[in-house]
Swiss-Prot record:
Function: Specifically dimethylates two adjacent adenosines (A1518 and A1519) in the loop of a conserved hairpin near the 3'-end of 16S rRNA in the 30S particle. May play a critical role in biogenesis of 30S subunits.
Record: residues binding S-adenosyl-L-methionine: 11, 13, 38, 58, 86, 101
Broad enzyme group: transferase
Pfam families per record: RrnaAD
Lineage of producing organism: Bacteria, Pseudomonadati, Campylobacterota, Epsilonproteobacteria, Campylobacterales
Protein name (record): Ribosomal RNA small subunit methyltransferase A
Protein family according to the UniProt entry: Belongs to the class I-like SAM-binding methyltransferase superfamily. rRNA adenine N(6)-methyltransferase family. RsmA subfamily.
An annotated Gene Ontology molecular function: RNA binding
Reactions this protein catalyses: adenosine(1518)/adenosine(1519) in 16S rRNA + 4 S-adenosyl-L-methionine = N(6)-dimethyladenosine(1518)/N(6)-dimethyladenosine(1519) in 16S rRNA + 4 S-adenosyl-L-homocysteine + 4 H(+)
Keywords, in A-Z order: Cytoplasm, Methyltransferase, RNA-binding, rRNA processing, S-adenosyl-L-methionine, Transferase
InterPro entries assigned to the protein according to its UniProt record, in alphabetical order: KsgA/Erm, rRNA_Ade_diMease-like_C, rRNA_Ade_Mease_Trfase_CS, rRNA_Ade_methylase_Trfase_N, rRNA_adenine_dimethylase, SAM-dependent_MTases_sf
Assigned GO CC terms: cytosol
EC number: 2.1.1.182
Length: 271
């Protein structure tokens, strides 16, 4: 019997109906490689292997051992590359699509890593519902929604109740999808000079991420007050005010009321 480790935020999805819904929600992958974070009890992994070659990252050596045993018991060939490694250090040389039931405590960081990685072309993940809603909201209510919609489109697909897991978490989970869009990536990459497109895209994402942290540092305060506290951007405050005037927005505007952050950042960097 496998005992979930609280230190790794393990809650294993066991409900067959939700496992099937996740697999069926995958978009067409060819020619993308499919990457999974976390094998868990192997239930989702085996369903994926029935349809696709798969590479999966798992930090828990006990779960890796259990997964290898389950594969042997299946007595049929699977195309699985099982990597016993922390997914925070995931690095692929080929374009891929990411799928995972992410641990709550590290879900946001792993999603941001995938968004930042030019090789990742999209993701289908399950997180705490609150986190999923932050990524999928269509406006500029928070930094996460701005980041994801600057590089692609995020769609909330369905909720998963605590009863679908073992052990059950205290909150609902949600499955959401992100598909990156080349035209949006091109606009983000154009922010900074770099010899290669992927390098420019990654630097553009990191620059926008840093800027949004400053803008949303205190969401209830005005954008100007937040940037005054930022070592990196306080000297650009006059240019921010100029931009607001050009956009017919008041100086009292909050971060959540900015319509186009990429346009604002481009103005600050190049204007």
């Amino acid at each position: 019997m496998v005992v979930a480790k609280k230190s790794l935020g393990q809650h294993f999805l066991t409900d067959e109906s939700f496992l099937d819904r996740i697999v069926n929600a995958l978009p067409p992958l060819n020619p993308l490689k499919l990457i999974e974070i976390g094998v868990g009890l192997g239930d989702l992994t085996l369903k994926l292997l029935d349809r696709y070659p798969l590479k999966t990252y798992e930090i828990d050596s006990n779960l890796c051992e259990k997964m290898r045993a389950r594969l042997k018991a299946q007595k049929k060939p699977f195309q699985l590359e099982l990597v016993e490694k922390d997914a925070l250090f995931l690095k692929e040389e080929e374009p891929y699509f990411l799928i995972s039931n992410l641990p709550y405590y590290i879900a946001t960081r792993l999603v941001l890593n995938a968004l930042k990685d030019p090789k990742c072309r999209g993701l289908l993940v399950m997180t705490q519902k609150e986190v999923a809603l932050k990524f999928c909201t269509k406006d500029s209510q928070n930094a996460l929604s701005v980041l994801v919609h600057t590089i692609g489109n995020a769609t909330l697909l369905f909720d998963v109740p605590p009863s679908a897991f073992s052990p059950p978490p205290k909150v609902f989970s949600s499955v959401f999808e992100v598909i990156k869009e080349p035209l949006k990536e091109k606009a983000l990459a154009s922010l900074l000079q770099a010899p290669f497109f992927e390098e420019a895209l990654q630097k553009g994402f990191e620059t926008l991420e840093d800027f949004l942290k400053a803008c949303f540092s205190s969401p209830r305060k005005t954008l100007s007050n937040n940037l005054k506290k930022s070592v990196s951007y306080r000297e650009k405050l006059d240019k921010v005010l100029d931009f607001l005037a050009l956009e017919n927005q008041p100086t009292s505007v909050r971060a959540s009321e900015i319509k186009d952050y990429l346009k604002l950042l481009e103005y600050l960097l190049k204007g």
